[in-house]
Each structure stands twice: as structure tokens, then as C-alpha cells.
Amino acid sequence: TINLDYKTTRLKYSGILNPFQLGYSGRNGITYRQQLRFSKTFKKDRQLRFRPEVGFVFKRKELFFKFEGDWEYLPEKQGALSLSLGNTNQGYSSKIMNEINEQLKDSTFNFENLDLEYFKHYYIELKNQIELFNGFQMTTGISYHRRIPTRKSAIDPGDGVTEIINENYHDFIPTIGFSYTPRQYYWMDGYRKEYLYSYYPTISIEFGRAIPSVWKSSGNYGRVEADIHQSIYLGLSRRFNYHISGGLYTAQKSTYFADYRYFTRHNFPESWGGDDFGGVFHQLGSVWFNASDKYVQAHAMYESPFMLFQLFKPEATKHIISERFYLSQLWMPVKPSYTEIGYGFGNHIFNVAAFVGFDKLKYDGIGFKFAFELFQ
């Protein structure tokens, strides 16, 4: 890892051959990524930030990249203009799913057995965030999405469906979102306002509207998502986090891809510092993240330095800094009840966790995740 801090310029690079950038999860297998962080501070603490990263998922042989930059033009109001471009998870639309199922009802094919990773997803997004008053932020943005088939389908499920799964899709989506944390405590680091904590939850809502006929865009639909989360500190390094969110697609006048902000697959295991709320499904199959036009999810995480290891291996507590219990629940029309229970432990060097999934209370698999904490 390379760290450079010279006057108003900072540079951090993970290094080309750095084993601490390796990770593992049951769904994705071994992962490896590279991260670079650059920042330049100007007068009145205005700051330019550049954060490119690239990662590879060995199990699926997929390369992910993201180039992101911010210009913090009004640090006392957390005003920042951001530009991001990259690729995300492959997927397909709910309409494609419905069409294929209709055509395959009388065939030997089964939806669950098909290879459903039909479309690569590339995007570019420009957004602006600013605080209107203490704890209340507004975010506006525009994004453009391009989805192209990973390959021309060899399956011929019926008239019309082959064309649907071999077509390119483009979406132009303006968004507006609001986030509010009542009685938000903060401090001023020079001109820069930094949030500290609040005894109340953070409530967020975002509206998006796909507009057709803009740069070849064909999407014509709406998306609404809401989220509430909070981290409650209980003293002695103990805390309880919860995270509840839901979303739906409205006014569906075109083919659309169920691409949610809060309900998405994570490809790279995060360090515990980047996993504050535990709001992630680790064992849920990738097909389900695109399978519905609406969802509701809830996650809870309890963290404490003395739990199972204190009971069964007291001598190990000097090496284990903290333990965590996870509980997650998902509802979608196509999957009315999915539950995950997890347990993890970690220290300043690594974190590891195990998760068990249940579909309608029936065992649905077990998996593990591992990530290094050093040099993150």
C-alpha cells in the first residue's frame, strides 16, 4: 500500500500485488480489487477527489470497474458535484422473465435452470448533493444506462422472445432524493462540516423517472425507493444497527430493468468499517435481485466484543476484537419470505462471517465471507 501526504495533496494506492485486497464469499468465490484515492484541497477547504477502482470476481470471471470523482465546492454545506462511470452486475428485465416463462410453460426448459445473465450493464451518472439545513440533504442527478447482451442467445423460446433478449437497451434517468437525520450533531473542521452522530434514525427517499427518446433511450417508467437506518451505541463497544428499505417501479410503459439502489448484489466483501449496517443479503441467488418490480427488506446487526467466544473460548477474546450477529428478511411477490441468519467475528487484521439462508423457513444454503482489515 502506498500513502502520500504532501501539504494539500493526498494519495493512497492499494498496490498491484497486495494480498490484503483479496476477499472471499460463498456466492462470488475469490475476489481481488485495486483502489486508488487522490484528493487535493484548495482554499476554504474546497476539495477535488478522484477514486478509481477495478476488481475481478474469479468464480464468474467478471471484471468490474468504477471511475468516480467529486468536486466539493461548498464544504460548509456538504455541497459536492460527483461524476461516476463504470459497470455493475449483469442482469435482465422483469418483462423478459415473464415472456420467457410464458413461452416455456409447455417446453422442457425450466426458468430456474436457464443461464439468466443476459445483459452487461454500463452507466454514467452525474449528481449534486447539498445540505439545505442541518441534517437535511438533497441529491439531484441524471444517469444514462446501456445494457447489451452478453451473447446472442442460442435458446429459441418462441416468437418475439429471441428478439427481446438480443436487443440493446438504453435508459436516461433523472433522479431527486432527500435524506434527513433529526438533531444531527456535527463539527466544523475548518470550513468543512462533518457529521458525528444522532440519537435518531436517518430517513431517505429517492424518485427516478426514465425519459424515452434521449440519446437512444427507450425506458419509460418510474422508480421510488425509501430507506431508514440507524446505529444505536449501547456502550462498551456494543451497538445495534437496523436498516429497512423498500422500492417499486411505477408507470411501467416500457421494458425496464429492476436496478435498485438499496437492494443490490455486492461483489466484494467489505471491511467492517465499510459494513456499518449489515444491509446485505449474502446467500441470496443473483437472479432474485432483478426478479421483481417491488421489494421490502429489513436487516439487523448486533455487535459486541464478548459473546460466543467468551462462553466457549475465553482465551481467544484477547485476539478477537468484536463479534456480530446478523438477521435479514426479504419480501418480494415472487419470493414472499427469504431469511438470512449470520454470525461473524473479526479484529484489526481480518473479519470472517457465516450466513445461512431460508426460503419460507426451509433451509436454502450456507456460505461464508472473508475480508482483510489491514491497509483498507
Residue ranges and their predicted role:
Residues T1-Q376:
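Exposed, low-structure sequence patches enriched in small/polar residues
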